[in-house]
Amino acid sequence: MIGVDTNILVRYFTQDDAEQAKIVEQIIDTHATSAHSLFINNIVIVELIWVLERGYKYQKEEIAKLIKQILSTEEFAFENHKLLWLALAQYNQNNLDFSDALIGEINKEACCIETLTFDKSAIKARNFTLAQRKF
């Protein structure tokens, strides 16, 4: 198994650098020949979404479709495949960042009863509670 960094996926999906995109295509053709031969960790997915949103101005719907495609690719292995799917569902259903959705899902998987936050958009999602002072 070989791990890939965010920029590998950015080049592959945006094709914004022809030379690097060609290298990435060769890597995928060579190493993505059997199930789970390329490893994508959680941070790579979070960074990819951030880069596509901020740097390339992709819309949320485009990003969600792309992440679904990545998560459905048999030749990719993931750090937390199930949690990435759950975070994607939260990202689609609520007005929150994918990173927040993933934080909530990871914490729930780690048996946290809630995730405290001051982020008012994150509290719209499951697993989050507004942190406040108790008297």
What do these predicted ranges mean?
Residues 5, 47, 100, 119:
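Acidic active-site catalytic centers that drive phospho-/nucleotidyl reactions
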Residues 9, 45, 122-123:
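A generic structural signal for short hydrophobic patches within well-formed alpha-helices
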Residues 75-118:
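Active-site neighborhoods of divalent-metal-dependent phosphate/nucleic-acid chemistry enzymes
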Residues 57-71, 75:
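Glycine/small-residue-rich phosphate/adenosyl-binding loop
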Residues 1, 104-135:
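Acidic, PIN/NYN-like endoribonuclease modules and their adjacent C-terminal/linker elements
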Residues 41-44, 83:
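Short, conserved alpha-helical segments within structured domains
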Residues 1-40, 55-60, 133-135:
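Short, well-structured N-terminal submotif of metal-dependent ribonuclease cores
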